[in-house]
């Protein structure tokens, strides 16, 4: 029994994801697949286009056996926290043999070598780094330069660390090294066209191009373009959600809620929220005063230092009321602390009984039971998860599905 | 020079308003008309269908000469506060000779007699009242019974005080008496069909039937039904707003903002807001958790004691962050303290120069100047006005008009 772990968002599940899933099984020789998936809000600081239960169905119908939720506090965080949270879950459940991630580079040894340097920080690397920092370079620039020097230019560092999936991959590898995990990392070279993620370009298109297509098309039933770039089961699940009036959910739907919150606050109040560092509160305030759309709001806060995804995560933090204090409290944990099951198939059921034996963290099958018994900090974390969903569902087109408390009422997906 | 004062909402201005305006001029013999009008939020605790500047245009084009804003803290308040705020402004500007209001009863003497009893509280009335309260009657029921006894059944008290415009009229009369105003009150019997305010019934229809019609029809240009029940100038202004994408604004537009705010709060936090008395916080909380629409939210909070309009005002208070503390502070004033000009015509300009000489309260022509010079409590009141508009404009369909600060940038309407 070989178990493969995948770290995913599936927003929504498309042919590229299917390719990755099938190739990963092939190269690992694994016969079971566990996915750790972000929930109703994703790493970019946006709501997912359809909820996590629908995306769980997509994953299971495409070959995943078990889907575990990456808690919001890890899912909607920087690449480093996202990666370490997901890796910790896959490690802590005690049954995963391989992790396979997509990367632009495609060679796990090189990426892992970089991860090793960054985790172990050998003396000469550290002195290169210090030198560059003393020269006035920013931390990322100093790190890049130190890596180049340390590897004696044997690796094309700038090219590798300029690609988002390589960066994320290195973070997975760092996380595995830090916890001395026995999980074997693998990577698959990404085959999608990264030069054009804006538009659907063929059978393999980016998730963002698909979301963009959905936001501009008004398809509510069968759609040629989506059928070309997503597995049929995914398209069916997507339209099942749309026709029920549960989505598509877009960040734009949060314009009134987020902007009105900020318009009501003073810059000093904005300052209290997570990741709002000095000066940014004024940018956020004046952006909310002038912005007519969510996109405008984000764009007018962004700077070179504050990237779009970082700004989006900050705004979602404001939406959910996550203060710097909360963040301090939540980050006292170095791991997600629990594995919440979103769905499984019959093979996943076998995995669950293995996990029950081997996991070092509790398995959460029923949130209402778990929340009663857990400690206060974990409780705050779960309350955040519950609130996030209570706010997410308000964006549904169909009022009948906007009820709060769906984290308690929604059943685990069993396929 | 005779000046007539009208207290209005014009949401939107229709034939019934025109009839009232013209009849009032006729019976008073006045040659000038000053309107005190609620702003972007109205007495029922709802946003106005189009903004106050558009409604000012409607008023001026229908025969009003000067429009003064009733500040939010009075406009979105109980009949008593609404009436006393509006009457105080008309009194304090020092030039108004008559106030003429619509009433179901139509006889100002009878209404004023009731007002006199309620203001002066003669001994025998007071003892009737005490008796009924001691018998366990609610205050409104005890008052009704005491009035019946005091007037020795010479007036049909129950019939009079069961009609909303009589009630409001009595409040105007009470306010005039309390401040010993020299303004002469007049009333006109309302001619609209009160038995059916749900649907447009003819050339005189209620404002709520017109709003309902607009919410269900999708007219964005000329419309037969509206043309039948509103003056042409009003219809034109309405469609000018709609086609620019500034409205129609409905309370339903506030569903995500208000509901998400409440979903984030504990009942204890809800308790801090204005007019939320013991126990209501739990109703509000659970209503927000289950409601899929604003209408549902309101309906599930209402009780016999908490009427729909009261609940709506409470929800708007939560939206704007008005706490009980704020309310205590704001109600330290017994009058609006200033007269903010929304618009005028050439005759209104003449009035303004008279007001400048005779008014006991400052005339606000430029908010940015006034807010700098006023005292802290008044400043809080104005900030509330500014915030209300900053939140109101976010509901516009056209993102270009959603900017904050329109209280500062919008010019006075001069026609």
UniProtKB/Swiss-Prot annotation, chains A, B:
Q: SUPFAM superfamilies per the record? A: Nucleotidylyl transferase (SSF52374)
Give the enzyme's EC designation.
Answer: 6.3.4.-
What GO MF annotations does this protein's record show?
Answer: ATP binding; ligase activity, forming carbon-nitrogen bonds; tRNA binding
Q: Which reactions fall under this protein's catalytic activity?
A: cytidine(34) in elongator tRNA(Met) + acetate + ATP = N(4)-acetylcytidine(34) in elongator tRNA(Met) + AMP + diphosphate
Predominant location: cytoplasm
Keyword ATP-binding among record annotations: yes
- Please provide the Gene Ontology terms (biological process) for this protein: tRNA modification
| Family assignment from sequence similarity | Belongs to the TmcAL family.
Record-given protein name: tRNA(Met) cytidine acetate ligase
Q: Which organism is it from?
A: Acetivibrio thermocellus (strain ATCC 27405 / DSM 1237 / JCM 9322 / NBRC 103400 / NCIMB 10682 / NRRL B-4536 / VPI 7372)
